[in-house]
C-alpha cells in the first residue's frame, strides 16, 4: 500500500493536541491510526517527491504482513515499523441492493 503525505497534512497534524494519521486499505477490515508523535520523527527518513518549490509529498509505504504484521517502511534508515498496535477495526458494511 502506498500513500502520499503532503506538507499541509503534516502541519495540520502538528498543530493538534493529539493528531493521528489514519490510513485505510480497500481490501482490509481495519485501518491504521498512527499517532503524529510516532510519525513525526521518521518523516526525514521517508522518500519524497519534490519540485522547484520544495517537497510536494512524502511517500508512505506499508508492506504486506511479515510474521502476521503489516509494516511501515522507513527507507532512508533501512528499517520497518510494525503497525500492529495501530490497527483499528472497521465496521463491516453490507452491500446495498439497488432496484433497477
Regions found by a protein language model. Name each.
Residues 1-31:
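Catalytic cores of nucleic-acid endonucleases
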Residues 28, 32-100:
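Non-catalytic C-terminal interaction segments of nucleic acid-processing enzymes
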